[in-house]
UniProtKB/Swiss-Prot annotation:
This is Glyceraldehyde-3-phosphate dehydrogenase. D-glyceraldehyde 3-phosphate binds at residues 151-153, 182, 211-212, 234. Its main location: cytoplasm. Pathway: Carbohydrate degradation; glycolysis; pyruvate from D-glyceraldehyde 3-phosphate: step 1/5. The active site is at residue 152. One of its GO terms (biological process) is glucose metabolic process. GO terms for molecular function: glyceraldehyde-3-phosphate dehydrogenase (NAD+) (phosphorylating) activity; NAD binding; NADP binding. GO terms for cellular component: cytosol. Pfam families: Gp_dh_C, Gp_dh_N. It catalyses: D-glyceraldehyde 3-phosphate + phosphate + NAD(+) = (2R)-3-phospho-glyceroyl phosphate + NADH + H(+). It comes from Mycosarcoma maydis. Homotetramer. The record marks 179 as: Activates thiol group during catalysis.
């Protein structure tokens, strides 16, 4: 199958990292970008320089109102209304919706009016079907025009939860994600009417926050529906987060048995999705890691054979953006079958 042509709506953190991933891994061909808040020259600058992932490894320039990357021409639009973006004209059959604004089927479907065939929302959705690579792609329905890639945290938790649940059975569990700062947070204390704590200075605080990531696992693994919930701590780091899953198991297992099962899955059916390490790692060691989830064998503990705490890392930008592309490519293959 030839490379799938894609468009990116919203050239923020995820939009730009999706683009970088498409170049590094050569998985998809970005033919168009839309962002009404960034002019072309600023787009070049933001793509070229990144405080977390470094300088872009390639040639970036502009010509005739288009972005030129490694000699390839990419159409650039600045439409606020997604229905006005000429995706079809640009040849973008699949669109990554990464603004964080158009996260429902109704809103994201506006891209279809512009000529896109399918839309992947790079965020959880209230009504679009959610897919997590390595977990529930077998449930993909080609009739769906709009789907969600869930959240970065769900992409970390779900593969690990699947391995544990399939082998040992999860009776119930609580998840905590220690999550890096994101763009919605404040540099200094500022107004945040819906989340007072979320308005406090990101660099100065550990901020408790809500997350639907654990509950969302129940949507992609129906047998876990109602068995998991969780919360988050936002911490003063710029990238890489870590999931702590504390679970009660149906079938008793030693921690060594759990480690062995996760390692087995990481080398087989979840290779490339779930990683495994026994090294004495810290968060910076995972910047640029393309796995959805990397199990930290040395960090977990068990109280007894039925009650365990499991730890798994994730680059919440790079790994997640990789999965956006993987999902698009999977959809394109299924849609053309």
């Amino acid at each position: 199958m030839s490379q799938v042509n894609i468009g990116i709506n919203g050239f923020g953190r995820i939009g730009r990292i999706v683009f970088r991933n498409s170049v590094v891994h050569n998985t998809a061909n970005v033919v168009a970008i839309n962002d009404p808040f960034i002019d072309l020259e600023y787009m070049v600058y933001m793509l070229k320089y990144d405080s977390t992932h470094g300088v872009f490894n390639g040639d970036i320039s502009t010509k005739d109102g288009k972005l030129i990357v490694n000699g390839k021409s990419i159409a650039v639009f600045a439409e606020k209304d997604p229905s006005n973006i000429p995706w079809g004209q640009a040849g973008a059959h699949y669109v990554v919706e990464s603004t964080g604004v158009f996260t429902t089927i109704d809103k994201a479907s506006a891209h279809i009016k512009g000529g896109a065939k399918k839309v992947v929302i790079s965020a959880p959705s209230a009504d679009a079907p959610m897919y997590v690579c390595g977990v529930n792609l077998d449930a993909y329905d080609p009739k769906a025009q709009v789907v969600s890639n869930a959240s970065c945290t769900t992409n970390c938790l779900a593969p690990l939860a699947k391995v544990i649940h399939d082998k040992f059975g999860i009776v119930e569990g609580l998840m905590t994600t220690v999550h890096a700062t994101t763009a919605t947070q404040k540099t200094v204390d500022g107004p945040s009417a819906k989340d007072w704590r979320g308005g406090r200075a990101a660099a100065a605080n550990i901020i408790p926050s809500s997350t639907g990531a654990a509950k969302a696992v129940g949507k992609v693994i129906p047998s876990l529906n109602g068995k998991l919930t969780g919360m988050a701590f936002r911490v003063p780091t710029t990238n890489v987060s870590v999931v702590d899953l504390t679970a009660r198991l149906e079938k008793g297992a030693s921690y060594d048995e759990i480690k062995a099962e996760v390692k087995r899955a990481s080398e087989n059916e979840l290779k490339g999705i779930l990683g495994y390490t026994e090294d004495a790692v810290v968060s910076q060691d995972f910047i640029g890691n393309s796995h959805s989830s990397i199990f930290d064998a040395a960090a977990g503990i068990s109280l007894n054979n039925n009650f365990v705490k499991l730890v798994s890392w994730y680059d919440n930008e790079w790994g997640y953006s990789n999965r956006c592309l993987d999902l698009l490519v999977f959809m394109a293959q299924k849609d053309s079958a």
